[in-house]
From Swiss-Prot:
PROSITE patterns: RIBONUCLEASE_PH. One of its GO terms (biological process) is rRNA processing. Pfam families: RNase_PH, RNase_PH_C. Keywords: Nucleotidyltransferase, RNA-binding, rRNA processing, Transferase, tRNA processing, tRNA-binding. This is Ribonuclease PH. It catalyses: tRNA(n+1) + phosphate = tRNA(n) + a ribonucleoside 5'-diphosphate. Gene3D superfamilies: GHMP Kinase, N-terminal domain. Homohexameric ring arranged as a trimer of dimers. InterPro entries: ExoRNase_PH_dom1, ExoRNase_PH_dom2, ExoRNase_PH_dom2_sf, PNPase/RNase_PH_dom_sf, Ribosomal_Su5_D2-typ_SF, RNase_PH, RNase_PH_bac-type, RNase_PH_CS. Phosphate binds at residues 86, 124-126. Phosphorolytic 3'-5' exoribonuclease that plays an important role in tRNA 3'-end maturation. Removes nucleotide residues following the 3'-CCA terminus of tRNAs; can also add nucleotides to the ends of RNA molecules by using nucleoside diphosphates as substrates, but this may not be physiologically important. Probably plays a role in initiation of 16S rRNA degradation (leading to ribosome degradation) during starvation. Belongs to the RNase PH family. It comes from Ruegeria sp. (strain TM1040) (Silicibacter sp.). It comes from the Bacteria.
Length: 237
């Protein structure tokens, strides 16, 4: 029995509110249960030096958590003068994931930065950031297309992410914090709307797992990301 009472293959309730901020070219507030993340996308007419003059675009991401996003206050990373290792890892993951769904030639030589700010955390913040980040990216690109700044849609496939794990001996979809903190196996799965894999992160937290168990988690992830892709499309319609 899951603490939330959800079925093993049931996600938390998900909502995506677009246009949450007025200044960013694309924005949304995504809620996956009690995990809430504000995602914004900013278009800039520049690219990193290593691709300047190549004609290729770039999508990157930044990630952060508000001090009271969790049950105890965290010190702002800006106050310490540097980002923590976890933050750097997650924002690189978000950037990699989103770029997998982008035709960088069609995007043209410009950069889109996706900022993901966790307002409240209850497990799965990186997955919510990727899923909401794609929505913000989609909305920003829509503005480029409407203005005629790009001639072809550079977004080739929706990108979303979901966590899966083994909790109390059972494979479960979309772990919240109580489950995540006690899971024997924990994994994050990033997939395209067409069902292709972008990245899989799995680790044995308390017990090792078999190939069959991994396949069960993969099936759950495919179900979850397919549902999220439909929600993304509906939010951007």
């Amino acid at each position: 029995m899951r603490p939330s009472g959800r079925a093993l293959n049931e996600m938390r309730s998900v909502s995506i509110e677009t246009g949450f901020t007025k200044h960013a070219e694309g924005s949304c507030l995504i809620k996956m249960g009690d995990t809430h993340v504000l995602c914004t996308a900013t278009i800039e007419d520049r690219v990193p030096p290593f691709i300047k003059g190549s004609g290729l675009g770039w999508v990157t991401a930044e990630y952060g958590m508000l001090p009271r996003a969790t049950n105890t206050r965290m010190r702002r990373e800006a106050a310490s003068g540097k980002q923590g290792g976890r933050t750097v890892e997650i924002q690189r993951l978000i950037g990699r994931a989103l770029r997998a769904g982008v035709d960088r030639v069609a995007l043209g030589e410009r950069q889109i930065t996706v900022d993901c700010d966790v307002l409240q955390a209850d497990g799965g913040t990186r997955c919510a950031s990727i899923t909401g980040g794609w929505v913000a990216l989609r909305l920003a690109v829509n503005k480029l297309m409407k203005a005629g700044d790009v001639t072809m849609d550079p977004l080739v496939d929706p990108v979303s992410a979901i966590s899966c794990g083994i909790y109390a001996g059972q494979p479960v979809l979309d772990l919240d914090y109580p489950e995540d903190s006690e899971a024997g196996v924990d994994g994050n799965f990033i997939m395209t709307g067409s069902g292709k894999l972008i990245e899989v992160q799995m680790s044995a937290e308390g017990s090792v797992f078999s190939r069959d168990q991994m396949n069960e988690l993969m099936d759950l992830a495919a179900k979850g990301t397919s549902e999220l892709a439909e929600m993304q499309k509906a939010a951007c319609a």
